[in-house]
Amino acid sequence: MASTTTCTRFTDEYQLFEELGKGAFSVVRRCMKIPTGQEYAAKIINTKKLSARDHQKLEREARICRLLKHPNIVRLHDSISEEGFHYLVFDLVTGGELFEDIVAREYYSEADASHCIQQILESVNHCHLNGIVHRDLKPENLLLASKSKGAAVKLADFGLAIEVQGDQQAWFGFAGTPGYLSPEVLRKDPYGKPVDMWACGVILYILLVGYPPFWDEDQHRLYQQIKAGAYDFPSPEWDTVTPEAKDLINKMLTINPAKRITASEALKHPWICQRSTVASMMHRQETVDCLKKFNARRKLKGAILTTMLATRNFSAAKSLLKKPDGVKESTESSNTTIEDEDVKARKQEIIKVTEQLIEAINNGDFEAYTKICDPGLTAFEPEALGNLVEGMDFHRFYFENALSKSNKPIHTIILNPHVHLVGDDAACIAYIRLTQYMDGSGMPKTMQSEETRVWHRRDGKWQNVHFHRSGSPTVPIKPSCIPNGKENFSGSTSLWQNI
């Protein structure tokens, strides 16, 4: 077999510098392209820790970012795979977050808010024209190109972005950030490009008064507010906002996505395209003061999550931040991205690996079996007479003395599989295992057992760490008409079902 040459293009062409940010499986560092001296931001993903699903998402993000070339979008310049790592080389944006810049300004008006949202709408319109839905528009993803006055707003982080055909509406999964989720996503209805416009409405509302339109300590009540479109323009802060600004917000925060304003339509709205004559130029000190508090809350939430990640308690952090609808939770986590889009696919992944394990058993392939099982596999099974079995030796006996010596065809069906996902790297599956085979006289036989298996993902691979099987223990003495290891007197579990 020919050897594969390992790519070292990133290592050869780029020099890495300080860390700019960190995620669960990635780190962002400043880098320089050695031949040109040009500086960039490198997102470095540890691919050894990624599941097949994560690899697909990485490929999707790179594909989308390569497609989008716009002054108001952080541009991807290079995408390089090396041994164990993938490098995404982006624009180096040095201006920080838009919302942090606003509170540092001496003067901030409605006209400034109009200019900000115009740039955001330009980026969203470019995405939509190219069949891309961002799905996670929020202040954290709105950056400034530099610290210079009048620097361009740049839309960042396309990790949740999806590709759509035209005005396609479909269920792409529950994804986004709680305070910015649209009613159709919360209703679990088909959705598409309009979800980004709803988020733009939330952002514009905050830009004008410094606090969000939807807010509640209880996440269930927050979601009820959003689904009902229950927001208003309270006095006195909204009294000084022009009717045209409120009109644009109303058009963006329209519950029915079919009637919601599009990005291209919003760019033609008088408050945007006739800013100099329509938008107020009055300084909004109250907005700046409220926005400072809003930013402080966001930073506190981010610091809490970072601490959880640093203490390697990421699963616990995600379980806290990803409560299901109806669970009481402070919206202090409302700037944290949620993604449940691939729950169905992840459950199918568990069913598939369970089927692979059973196939290894049926084939008497102990080598394949050990690759799928944790070396410290624990099990409760009838043959152990109520004792907890640990390790592979107990199972090795059946492979060496029955399974590998059997040449009879075996067919196994998994019935009614129920998968429980426990965080990102653990799952439990319960199912009925139906096994068909031919007995010594050539007659078809079927046996049934009820099984539960616990799976844990390590380095991107699922391993069975525990299982529990029902049934009666195999009787060691068998009638002569039945081949060794195939069935006991009562027709209960055969040796190939002991593992």
Curated annotation (Swiss-Prot):
<dbReference type="InterPro" id="IPR008271">
    <property type="entry name" value="Ser/Thr_kinase_AS"/>
</dbReference>
<feature type="region of interest" description="Autoinhibitory domain">
    <location>
        <begin position="283"/>
        <end position="292"/>
    </location>
</feature>
<feature type="region of interest" description="Calmodulin-binding">
    <location>
        <begin position="291"/>
        <end position="301"/>
    </location>
</feature>
<feature type="modified residue" description="Phosphothreonine; by autocatalysis">
    <location>
        <position position="287"/>
    </location>
</feature>
<dbReference type="GO" id="GO:0043005">
    <property type="term" value="C:neuron projection"/>
</dbReference>
<keyword id="KW-0067">ATP-binding</keyword>
<dbReference type="GO" id="GO:1903076">
    <property type="term" value="P:regulation of protein localization to plasma membrane"/>
</dbReference>
<feature type="binding site">
    <location>
        <position position="43"/>
    </location>
    <ligand>
        <name>ATP</name>
    </ligand>
</feature>
<dbReference type="InterPro" id="IPR013543">
    <property type="entry name" value="Ca/CaM-dep_prot_kinase-assoc"/>
</dbReference>
<feature type="modified residue" description="Phosphoserine">
    <location>
        <position position="404"/>
    </location>
</feature>
<dbReference type="GO" id="GO:0010613">
    <property type="term" value="P:positive regulation of cardiac muscle hypertrophy"/>
</dbReference>
<feature type="modified residue" description="Phosphothreonine">
    <location>
        <position position="336"/>
    </location>
</feature>
<feature type="modified residue" description="Phosphoserine">
    <location>
        <position position="494"/>
    </location>
</feature>
<keyword id="KW-0597">Phosphoprotein</keyword>
<feature type="active site" description="Proton acceptor">
    <location>
        <position position="136"/>
    </location>
</feature>
<keyword id="KW-0723">Serine/threonine-protein kinase</keyword>
<dbReference type="GO" id="GO:0033017">
    <property type="term" value="C:sarcoplasmic reticulum membrane"/>
</dbReference>
<dbReference type="GO" id="GO:0042383">
    <property type="term" value="C:sarcolemma"/>
</dbReference>
<dbReference type="GO" id="GO:0005516">
    <property type="term" value="F:calmodulin binding"/>
</dbReference>
<dbReference type="GO" id="GO:0060341">
    <property type="term" value="P:regulation of cellular localization"/>
</dbReference>
<keyword id="KW-0007">Acetylation</keyword>
<feature type="modified residue" description="Phosphoserine">
    <location>
        <position position="330"/>
    </location>
</feature>
<feature type="modified residue" description="N6-acetyllysine">
    <location>
        <position position="318"/>
    </location>
</feature>
<keyword id="KW-1003">Cell membrane</keyword>
<dbReference type="InterPro" id="IPR032710">
    <property type="entry name" value="NTF2-like_dom_sf"/>
</dbReference>
<feature type="modified residue" description="N-acetylalanine">
    <location>
        <position position="2"/>
    </location>
</feature>
<comment type="function">
    <text>Calcium/calmodulin-dependent protein kinase involved in the regulation of Ca(2+) homeostatis and excitation-contraction coupling (ECC) in heart by targeting ion channels, transporters and accessory proteins involved in Ca(2+) influx into the myocyte, Ca(2+) release from the sarcoplasmic reticulum (SR), SR Ca(2+) uptake and Na(+) and K(+) channel transport. Targets also transcription factors and signaling molecules to regulate heart function. In its activated form, is involved in the pathogenesis of dilated cardiomyopathy and heart failure.</text>
</comment>
<dbReference type="InterPro" id="IPR011009">
    <property type="entry name" value="Kinase-like_dom_sf"/>
</dbReference>
<feature type="modified residue" description="Phosphoserine">
    <location>
        <position position="490"/>
    </location>
</feature>
<keyword id="KW-0418">Kinase</keyword>
<feature type="binding site">
    <location>
        <begin position="20"/>
        <end position="28"/>
    </location>
    <ligand>
        <name>ATP</name>
    </ligand>
</feature>
<feature type="modified residue" description="Phosphothreonine">
    <location>
        <position position="331"/>
    </location>
</feature>
<keyword id="KW-0472">Membrane</keyword>
<feature type="modified residue" description="Phosphothreonine">
    <location>
        <position position="337"/>
    </location>
</feature>
<dbReference type="GO" id="GO:0005524">
    <property type="term" value="F:ATP binding"/>
</dbReference>
<feature type="modified residue" description="Phosphoserine">
    <location>
        <position position="315"/>
    </location>
</feature>
<dbReference type="GO" id="GO:0005737">
    <property type="term" value="C:cytoplasm"/>
</dbReference>
<feature type="domain" description="Protein kinase">
    <location>
        <begin position="14"/>
        <end position="272"/>
    </location>
</feature>
<dbReference type="GO" id="GO:0004683">
    <property type="term" value="F:calcium/calmodulin-dependent protein kinase activity"/>
</dbReference>
<dbReference type="GO" id="GO:0014069">
    <property type="term" value="C:postsynaptic density"/>
</dbReference>
<dbReference type="Pfam" id="PF00069">
    <property type="entry name" value="Pkinase"/>
</dbReference>
<keyword id="KW-0703">Sarcoplasmic reticulum</keyword>
